[in-house]
């Protein structure tokens, strides 16, 4: 049995198959203006997750149409806080002809963190840390055997 996640996405995004998870899609256009750091033109990821986690009871990944950052990093594609059961994926850097593929990978990656998986050293594994879009494009949308085994142990 696959683990379950809820994905809350802007209404412009169509539901996508997230191969490693049973996925419930909800559509909500979230006002990002109060998350935006005007000096950077980016949303601070940890503050976004904290704000959106209110009332979350099961693993939930929010998809936001903005660019995200975390203190000490120029940008992040997403951030998960397992204790809050909440993650966020930012779409700004995923644009292009591979947008849907990239979005699936980033949702899967952050959902993996929500279930307790760490970053993986295997560059083909979806849990590999992406420093760039090239890293995201190279990796698959699937867990490697080691991460799949770790997830099975966690579940």
From Swiss-Prot:
Molecular function per GO: metallopeptidase activity; zinc ion binding
Cross-referenced InterPro entries: MetalloPept_cat_dom_sf (IPR024079), Pept_M54_archaemetzincn (IPR012962), Pept_M54_archaemetzncn_arc/bac (IPR012091)
Taxonomy, superkingdom: Archaea
Cofactor field: Zn(2+)
EC number assigned by the record: 3.4.-.-
Organism this protein belongs to: Pyrobaculum aerophilum (strain ATCC 51768 / DSM 7523 / JCM 9630 / CIP 104966 / NBRC 100827 / IM2)
Keyword flag Secreted: no
Function statement: Probable zinc metalloprotease whose natural substrate is unknown.
Entry note: cofactor: Binds 2 Zn(2+) ions per subunit. One is catalytic, whereas the other seems to have a structural role.
GO term, biological process aspect, one: proteolysis
SUPFAM superfamilies with a match to the protein in the record: Metalloproteases ('zincins'), catalytic domain
Family listed: Belongs to the peptidase M54 family.
Protein residues bound to Zn(2+) 1: 109, 113, 119
Keywords (A to Z) from UniProt: Hydrolase, Metal-binding, Metalloprotease, Protease, Zinc
Protein name: Archaemetzincin
């Amino acid at each position: 049995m696959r683990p379950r996640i809820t994905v809350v996405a802007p209404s412009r995004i169509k539901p996508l198959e997230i191969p490693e998870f049973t996925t419930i899609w909800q559509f909500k256009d979230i006002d990002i203006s109060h998350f935006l750091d005007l000096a950077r033109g980016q949303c601070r990821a940890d503050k976004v997750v904290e704000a959106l986690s209110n009332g979350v009871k099961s693993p939930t990944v929010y998809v936001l149409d903005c660019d995200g950052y975390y203190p000490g990093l120029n940008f992040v594609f997403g951030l998960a806080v397992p204790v809050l059961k909440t993650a966020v994926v930012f779409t700004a850097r995923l644009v292009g002809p591979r947008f849907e593929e990239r979005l699936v990978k980033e949702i899967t990656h952050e959902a993996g963190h929500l279930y307790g998986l760490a970053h993986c050293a295997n560059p083909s594994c979806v849990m590999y840390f992406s420093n760039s879009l090239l890293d995201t494009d190279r990796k698959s949308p699937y867990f490697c055997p080691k991460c799949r085994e770790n997830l099975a142990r966690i579940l």
